[in-house]
Amino acid sequence: MKKIKNLILTISIVYIAQGYAQDNVETAALWPFDEQLGIYPSCVISDLSDNDYPLVLGPGGQIVPGKFGNSLEPIEHPKIEYPEDDNVKFGLKALPVPEGRMMEPMNWMNANFCALMTSGENHLRKQVGFVHPTETALNLGQFNWTVEFWYQPTRSSPDNGVVFEIGEGPRGENQKITQLLLDSEEHAFLLVNQPGNVILRIPSDPEISNHLSGDWYHLAFVYDDTEGQLIHFVNGERQTLPERCSIIALSRGEEDYMSIGRDGLWNNPLPGKIDELRFSKGKRYQENFPPPESFSYIVKDEKPVKKVSGKKLLFVDNEVPILLENRKHLFLDDVLIVENKNITFSVNPPKMAERVIENIKGPFRKHLNVIEDDDGLLRIYNAVDDDYLAVRTSEDGINWEVPDLPNGYYKDKTNIVLHESTGMGVVFIDPNASPEERWKYISDYHRRGVFLYHSADGWSFKRYKIPVLPFRSGSQANLFYDDQRQLYVAYHRSDFTKTLSGDTERTFVMTETADLIKPWPFKPVSQEKSLEMAMSHRVHDLHPWYLDNGPLTPMGFSFEYPNIFGPDDSIDPRETDIYVPKAMKYPWAEDTYLAFPVVYFHYEESTPLTRVILMDPDRGRGSGPIETQVATSRDGIHWKRFPRPVYIGNGQHENWPVNQAYMAHGMIRRGDEIWQYYFGTEIYHSTWSKDKSKSAVYRVVQRFDGFISADSPYEKEGYLITKPLIFAGNRLVLNIDTDATGYAQVGFLDEDGQPIPGFTVDDCVFINGDFIETEVEWFPNWRDFPSMEGKKIEELEPYKKEFRFSKDVSALQGKVVQVVFRMRGSKLYSMQFMER
C-alpha cells in the first residue's frame, strides 16, 4: 500500500511540474476539424466530447490541412451562382427582414459563416441536432474554464479576427455576446464579455502574427473564477497576465448561436488556421507545460494494419491464359467462356421455407441484416422504436428469440444494441480489426452523415464521432471488406437522379476506402462540373447538389462517386428504381459478388393514368409494390442485374399475401444450403392501409452456389468452351443438376484447340443426377470394346477387367487447356479443380 501511495504522489508531482492543473476538468467540446478536405458548406463538423455538439461548415470556411490531420480556416468556398427557387426551407429564397428586426433571415445567399451552431433560423431545415450553446459550458462565465487550440497564421490582416463568438441571439440584433478576437497588429487577444461589461486585452507572443513563418502555436486561455484571473499560454509558456476581470455567462437565448472563425455577421475572419479547438470546464493548466499531442483518434490511430489478403481478381484485365488454379468458378455469366451454343444463364429463385418472425407489433424497420457469429449463433439486426438498432438471435435459424441484454432496455424492449436513432445500416465482422472492435456497423446518424460504429461482441455499439462520409443517406447502407482488393466497399443511396416524370429516383453510389476508420476519400464536385455532367445524366436541376437541404443540413450524394445501382431504361419500366442493393462479396468463392436489389415500381408520379389510378385511396394500396431481384459481379463495380425470374416476388407466401419483399443483407450456409431471410408484408409502400398484421420475416433456401446457372435446353444439346486457362489440382469437381433425363459430359482441349486424348468430351462418363460436388470421370478406352447398342448390361461382364476409368487430371495441371461442356437438360452451377 505504501508503494502505491508513493507512486500516486510521484505521478501527481510530475503532473503538477508539467503545468497540468489538478482541477476537476471536464471536456465541454472538442472539435478536431478532421473531416475530409474540401467538404461542402452545410456539412457537419463533429465534436469528440461526450456532449456531442455539432457545428455546420459554412460558405465562409473550409477544411484545410492542419497541425494534426486537418483544420478549419475562415476562407471562402469558390463562388457559385445560386439558382432561382421558391424553396424557403432549403435557403434558396430570400425572405424580407421581419418586423422589429434588422437582419435578413439566413439563406444561401447571405450565409457566409465559417462554422456555426444555432437555435435560430428556424425557417430552414435543421436536422443535425444543434444544442443551445448558452445552456452549456461553452457559455463562459463564473466557473473555472479553459479554451485552447492550435493556430497557424496564414495572412496579415489589419482587422481583428474572431476565434469564436457566442451570442444570446437573435443573431445580429443585439450585442449580448462573448467573443475571443485576435488583434494581430497589437500581438494580443481581446476577450469581449457583454454581461460582465468586459473588454479584456490579453498580451500574447508577437510570433503568433507572423504569417510568413509557417509555424503552429498552441494557445491556451485558462480562467480562475475565484481570482478573476485569466492566464494565457503560448506553446505552454505563460504570457504576461492581463488585468483581473469577472466573466459572466450569457442568459439563455431562444435563438442563441456559436460562430467559429467569424463573428455573428460573418465579418472579421480569423487570419489563419485553427486546429483542435477544445473548451473545458475547469483549469487544465496552471504553470508552464509541454504542448499536448493530438486529441483526435483520427491522428492517434495511425498504425499500420496487416489486412487479410485474398487472391488477385481474376477477370479485371482479361488476360489469357486465365490462371484459374484451384479457384471455384460460379457460372454467373460468360466471363470464362469463349464459345457458347444454346446455353443461357438463368436465375434460380430460392425455395420458400417458413415464417420465422411474426406477430410484429410497433415500429419494425424492413431493412434487416443477418449474420452468424463465431459461436454459430445467428443474429438478425434491424431498427425498432425510434430507429434504435435491435437484435434477435437463433440457434437453428427458424426459432428466433429476443435476448435480454444488460444494456438493451428501451421502452418495452430488452434487445437494443445501440441507444442512438440510427437503424439504417449494416452490421458486419471486420477481419482486420482488433478484438475490441471486430464488429462494425455503418449507418446515417441524425442526418449528419454516414457514421461508423464498433463493438467487441455485437451486443453494444459505440460511434466513432467523425463521420466517414459527410453526406446524409436515406436508406440502408451496404458495407463489406473485399479481401481480393484489400478495400472496404460500401454502397449508399442517392436521390440526385430523377425519373422520366421528374420525381426522385433512388439509385446507389459506391465508395471505396483502404482505411475504415478515417474519413473516406472524397473529392468535391464544382458547380461547373456538376452542370457539365448533368448534360448526360437525368438528374435534378439543382447545381451544386449540396444546396439541396439548405445551409444548416448536409446534402445527399451526387456525382462524387460512381453510380452503380439504378434503373436501366433499356429493360426497366419507367418510374422504377432501386431501393437498396443488398450487395455483398460471396464468402465461398473468389471473384464472386452478389446483390439482391430491392426494386420499387411507382404508382404515383408515373404515367399513364391507368397506372396512376392504382394509388387511388379507394383501392387500398399505396404508392407501389416492391420485389427483390438478383445481380452479379466479378469485381463489385460492374454489375449485371437479372430482373426475371424475380428472385423474391409478390404473392402468397406461407398463405400470407406479400406486396413488398425486402431481402435481408447477408446469408447463412448450412451444409448444402444457403439460408436467406426477407421481410414481407401485405401492405404497399406508402400504404393507405392501417392493417399491418400480416408482416413477417421469412426464411428462404437456396442451393449452395445456386443463384445463377448455365442452363442447357432439354430438346437439344448445348456447349460451352472456356477461354484458355491453367489449373491446379488432380480432380475437376462440378456442382450440377441434370435431373433424371438430362446429362452432361466434360472434356479438355490443348493449347492448339485440339481434343486431348483420354480427356475428350466423348470419353467422359455421363454425368447424370443432382450433385453439389461430383468428380468428373473419363473412360479413355471405351472405343476398344464392342458397341453396347441394344445390348444388356450383363454382356459387359467379360470386358470389365479391361475397362480403364480415371478422375485424375493431374497430367494436365499447369498446362494451358480449355474445358468443354456438353449438356442437355442440365443446370451447371460451379466448377473447381481440387487436390484429392
Name the predicted role of every residue range.
Residues 20-126, 240-243, 276, 290-310:
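Extracytoplasmic low-complexity segments
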Residues 30-33, 47, 147-155, 164, ...:
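Short hydrophobic/aromatic patches on beta-strands that form ligand-binding or substrate-lining surfaces
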Residues 120-122, 252-276, 283-284, 289:
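Extracellular glycan-interaction patches encoded by glycine-rich segments
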Residues 161-192:
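Glycan-recognition/cleft segments
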Residues 190-218:
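Short, aromatic/His-centered strand-loop micro-motif at the edge of beta-sheets
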Residues 215-231, 738, 824:
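Localized edge beta-strand/strand-to-loop motifs within extracellular or lumenal beta-rich domains
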Residues 234-256:
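Short, solvent-exposed beta-strand-to-loop segments that form ligand-recognition rims
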Residues 304-477, 481-580, 585-658, 678-836:
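Beta-rich carbohydrate-recognition and catalytic domains
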